[in-house]
Amino acid sequence: MKRAFIFACLTGLRFSDIQKLKWSEMQQSTELGHYIRFVQQKTKGSETLPISDEAYNLLGEKGKPTDPVFPDLIYSDSRNADLYRWMIKAGIEKHITFHCARHTYATLQLTLGTDIFTVSKLLGHRHLKTTQIYANVIDEKKTVAANKINIGL
């Protein structure tokens, strides 16, 4: 679960897409580096998602093409409890679900300067409006940051 959650933070993939991910969908080319070619569970859209070397290396030893990349990944209350305990150990008190990894990816991409159109495509969103939700989070952070500096005038 931990490895899959970190992979989601590094790729923005939904739980359902990570759960069904097969080794045959993991690709590499000189042009794109590591990438995943898959059909999204939610939208049924065909996607090509570039991933970082760090995300790829997290996967460990490559299995057979038909093998799942995360063979023991199931959605259950006990798995969510595992995730909760892991967060508590890390000092994170906020309620975290697996979907938070996707939010983390989007927010980090925007915070690090990736334009919203690219983030939208990386997430496989059909409409830019969907991605705008994450941009609003960044706008709130900018407002908070701007108000941190106060020289007492």
Label every PLM stretch briefly.
Residues 1, 32, 45, 64, ...:
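Exposed loop/turn and edge beta-strand positions of beta-sandwich/beta-sheet ligand-binding modules
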Residues 1-15, 19, 32-33, 65:
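Basic, Lys/Arg- and aromatic-enriched nucleic-acid-binding interface segment
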Residues 1-2, 76-77, 93-113:
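Short basic/aromatic active-site micro-motif
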Residues 6, 10, 16-17, 102-126, ...:
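C-terminal catalytic core of tyrosine-transesterase DNA break-rejoin enzymes
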Residues 11, 20-58:
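Conserved tyrosine-mediated DNA breakage-rejoining catalytic core shared by Y-recombinases
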Residues 40-44, 123-148:
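Catalytic-site neighborhood detector that most strongly recognizes the C-terminal catalytic loop/helix
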Residues 40-85:
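C-terminal catalytic core of Y-nucleophile DNA break-rejoin enzymes
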Residues 150-153:
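C-terminal secondary-structure termini that scaffold catalytic or DNA-interacting sites
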